[in-house]
Amino acid sequence: MAGEIFVSESLVIRLGTNAQQPVEWLVWSAKEEEIIASGILASAHALGELRERAGGRPVVTLVPGSDLIFRRVSLPGKYSRQAAAALPYLLEEQIASDVDELHLVVLGHEGHEVDLMAVDKEKMQIWLGWLQQAGLKSQQLLPDVLALPPAADGWSALQLGKEWLLRQGPCQGIVADESLLAMLLAAEADPVTIHSHTPLPAIPAANWLAADPELPMLLLAKGALNCQANLLQGPYRPQTEYSRYWLQWRKVAVVAGLLLLVALTQRGMHLYQLAEQDKALKAEIRQVYTRIFPGENRIVNVRSQMAQHLKLLGQTPQDGVLLLLTELAPTFAEVPGLKPQVLRFDAARGELRLQVTAPGFAEIERFRELAGKRFEVQQGEGAQHRGQG
């Protein structure tokens, strides 16, 4: 029933080389050790009929071993991920196909020896396309010959129609009709022991033994469910629920990350600008101080030293007078001959009274004119002293 989860039940499908070939399927219960349902579809176009059968069951797909290449190659050193990069070139020495068009999967390795299976990438796309169009998601895709039970002292065999499926070892297998199989067996140096799960053929040059008889599709289904080989690796690896969820939200996460980066950059720029402004302000305050008190070169704490000067001039330090002096600093700089002698600041009235000395009245008038551009200036009576101009 669709929507239910069958933990111990699996749907095993055996595809053909082309879409017109029949598709066998079987639902097997490992817990009950029985066939729940089985059948044959007319072609791959009818795979959609198995969507309800799949339901909450894992789907395992068998593909024709005749469409794959099985080879053993030798590496210069021991197998590693770095050494695996050389496998396509080593395989290219043994086959006539373009290795760039092949999907390679490592079945096993021991020392310098590596067992591979390879299939055309185009064929992979065809098989996966059939399943996708049918709404089926397979968690494993493996060659049917590796679903045969391995034989400890030889090969295992199964006849399907006019073809023989033979498993020659843990990572090796072939598919051949009777005439080709007879030629292959005749080429063996010593007779091969073959355990057949279907009636024995009349093929000499081999030691044929009858294995336990079993329904071909059931035999393959059981073997597939116990086999680790899987063509769904690399670019064909099925997505987990987490991966699908992540792919859906990846763009959102990227945009959010970019926005956060922009925000942090702007914040950093703002803090940098504030730091630069603070540095500039401190430099300006030092300039103001040196303009008002040009004779003092050692400046450690501008605020403290300014307060000391104000005390000497008879004025209690206040923020207001510091601000006014800061704004008047450029004016003092324009009239270098004019020097403040006494300051009086009335915070309530916002009024600063200055008693200054200058070489002459021209400097005082110049100071009044410049300060008058920003402040309201009233000039009191002046007195001329000897030695002052």
Curated annotation (Swiss-Prot):
The chain crosses the membrane at residues 249-265. Residues 266-389 are periplasmic. One of its GO terms (biological process) is protein secretion by the type II secretion system. Keywords: Cell inner membrane, Cell membrane, Membrane, Protein transport, Transmembrane, Transmembrane helix, Transport. Disulfide bonds: none annotated. InterPro entries: ATPase_NBD, GspL_cyto_dom, GspL_pp_dom, T2SS_protein-GspL. It is a single-pass membrane protein. Residues 1-248 are cytoplasmic. GO terms for cellular component: Gram-negative-bacterium-type cell wall; plasma membrane; type II protein secretion system complex. The keyword Membrane applies. The keyword Protein transport applies. Inner membrane component of the type II secretion system required for the energy-dependent secretion of extracellular factors such as proteases and toxins from the periplasm. Plays a role in the complex assembly and recruits ExeM resulting in a stable complex in the inner membrane. Provides thus a link between the energy-providing ExeE protein in the cytoplasm and the rest of the T2SS machinery. Belongs to the GSP L family. Type II secretion system is composed of four main components: the outer membrane complex, the inner membrane complex, the cytoplasmic secretion ATPase and the periplasm-spanning pseudopilus. Forms homodimers. Interacts with ExeM/GspM. Interacts with ExeE/GspE and ExeF/GspF. This is Type II secretion system protein L. It comes from Aeromonas hydrophila. The gene is exeL.
